[in-house]
Curated annotation (Swiss-Prot):
It comes from Pyrobaculum islandicum (strain DSM 4184 / JCM 9189 / GEO3). This is Homoserine kinase. ATP binds at P79, I80, A81, R82, G83, L84, G85, S86, S87, G88, A89. Belongs to the GHMP kinase family. Homoserine kinase subfamily. One of its GO terms (cellular component) is cytoplasm. Its EC number is 2.7.1.39. The gene is thrB. It is found in: Cytoplasm. Signal peptide: none annotated. HAMAP family: Homoser_kinase (MF_00384). Keywords: Amino-acid biosynthesis, ATP-binding, Cytoplasm, Kinase, Nucleotide-binding, Threonine biosynthesis, Transferase.
């Protein structure tokens, strides 16, 4: 079972919007055993004994009112600490694989809730945007947290994603939240409502122009931009090459550009050049909206 990489926020949709794309995938393999508890082996990056996958299973078992014996192997091919939802995708892939192996029928919101609560191990607090997209696929809007209400769209969108090879920022999520403004003006509030409305309407209509309007942001992105390597040059070069919009992927340092298929390669080359001129190594990919891990259980 596999779950895709994701990009949360997309500008104005801070903490309530994420998209699943086929840039990278996390994979999980499950074997049911006797007894109760989860034994997890990680191939590649090992997050340690207190990890998102383990916590996600604990929350799921608690919600289902039963414990299973599980051996899990997780292969996470999503770059770690890059704003691409790597920890959430690994948890979602493992839960989806378990549900299929155990022959269970579990509501998607229950899986998202368990994986989102499991994110405390990686981010220090629950996060549902990335895990919702990894589970459901497409573009997901969190309409409510309590109770958890998710709305999925499946727009045809293409992105160019730049993933810089830089050292992980210590306590990245905490730092990137600490720089956010505590108050905004009423004018900014109204403008931001208009943008997030355009973002959701763009998802619903599969309209890149509306999505691009929604990816503009004057609240979160300006505060975080100084902490994202090459942000200014990458954004400028991408827009000059024909990108429709550019924003930070999650809390960064990856950057995501909305593009048209006809000029995706041109934008990709422009983003690559921007990183080179900044003296940074980076992997740049063209990616499309994709389905999530739970779609494989249908």
């Amino acid at each position: 079972m596999r779950a895709p990489s994701t990009s949360a926020n997309l500008g104005s949709g801070f903490d309530v919007v994420a998209v699943a794309h086929d840039a990278y995938f996390a994979e999980a393999y499950i074997k049911l055993t006797s007894g109760c508890g989860v034994d997890i082996k990680f191939r590649g990056f090992n997050p340690g004994s207190d990890n998102t996958v383990k916590r996600a299973f604990q929350h799921l078992f608690e919600r289902l009112g039963r414990c299973w014996g599980v051996e899990a192997e997780v292969v996470n091919n999503i770059p770690i600490a890059r704003g691409l939802g790597s920890s959430g995708a690994s948890a979602v892939a493992a839960l989806a694989a378990f549900i299929r192996e155990a022959g269970l029928r579990v509501e998607p919101a229950v899986v998202v809730e368990a994986a989102g609560l499991g994110e405390v191990a990686a981010a220090g607090s629950p996060h549902f945007d990335n895990v919702a997209a990894a589970a459901l696929g497409g573009a997901v809007v969190i309409a409510s947290v309590k109770p958890l209400e998710l709305v999925k769209f499946m727009p045809k969108l293409i992105f160019v994603i730049g993933v810089p090879d830089v050292p992980p920022m210590p306590e990245k999520t905490k730092v990137m939240r600490s720089v956010l403004p505590r108050e905004v003006s009423f004018r900014t509030y109204v403008a931001q409502l208009a943008r997030v409305s355009a973002l959701v309407a763009g998802f619903a209509k599969s309209d890149p122009r509306l999505v691009a309007l929604g990816m503009s942001d004057e609240v979160v992105e300006p505060a975080r931009a100084p902490y994202v390597p090459a942000y200014g040059r990458v954004k400028r070069y991408a827009l000059e090459a024909g990108a429709l919009a550019v924003s930070i992927s999650g809390a960064g340092p990856s950057i995501i550009a909305l593009v048209e298929e006809k000029n995706s390669d041109v934008v990709k080359a422009a983003v690559e050049r921007a990183y080179i001129e900044e003296g940074l190594r980076a992997e740049v990919k063209v990616a499309s909206i994709t389905e999530g891990a739970l779609a494989q259980n249908i």
